[in-house]
Amino acid sequence: MLGSFCQRYPEIAIELEIANREKIVARLRDNEDDLYVMSHPPVDMDLVIRPFLSNEYVVVAPVAHRTVGRRLTLRELADESFLLREVGSGSRHIIDEHMLASGVHLKVRLSLASNEAIRELVSSGMGLAVLSRHALGEHPERDGLAILDVEGFPLKQPWSVVHLRNKVLSLPAQAFLDELLNSEPATSGPLPE
């Protein structure tokens, strides 16, 4: 999406900051940027929220893990060690909310700020993870990962483009917003979290 926009408008300089949800919300409160892409916008702010891409969170394991190919309950997940995104990330927020509502507590072995690091550690057998399907690419099995069949998953939380309701968007920001909302959605590929 960004690449096609930059090709269409080569004179527009883009500044892109990738951060976790906590930092993005702070930047949003301080009105530091034109637009924000996030999966879990805050509910306590007056925002314009425009979903533009479906986003599913799935449970992943190493391809040879004993749970691959079985239907699992959420309670069975409580027996596993998990590698999750750090507290403050949108992914972690969504996962924690879902597990709390389900009455299940996950054993978090390691919290990381990188989806790539989590993928690599899961494929090496260090534990399971919950990741956005976009973070897995088109063929997770090529990276030694399997998507598990777990009750209550996938968790669906769309990616949205967000700005303060009273924000007057610059012409370049409005052009990018229009491009984003009118483009064909990508089926895979990493997005910021």
Where are these regions (language model features)?
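A ligand-binding cleft/hinge motif common to bilobed small-molecule-binding domains
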Residues: E22, V37-D46, E97, A101, ...
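Residues embedded in well-ordered beta-strands
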Residues: L35, P51, V58-V60, S81, ...
